[in-house]
Amino acid sequence: MDMVKRFTVYLVNLDPVVNGKPRTSRPCVVISPDEMNRYLNTVIVAPLTSRKQDLPTRVPINFKLKPGQIALEQIRVLDKSRLIKPLGKLGDNTRDEVVRILGEMFSGG
């Protein structure tokens, strides 16, 4: 697999069984830094969802002409083998909002 880049949206296999045929896949954005992505076999991702909720951890997104949200309260660590294929990248404004909210979530304030 090519280098996994931060802020790239992938179709991800979220099914508990890795070696079987994927039954549960959804788009997720990679939020782990490129330095981690380069050296580790895992990535940190947040799922995209079309089910909107008014939460401070949600980032609005219009990806592939579909409105939705990035659910930062549902971040998870996955093995890179679960990344099925890249779907695109986040725009600059969306990236900035993801970084801002992650900073608030983990700043301890």
Named regions from a protein language model:
Residues 1-109:
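Conserved functional hotspots at enzyme active or ligand-binding sites that engage polyanionic ligands
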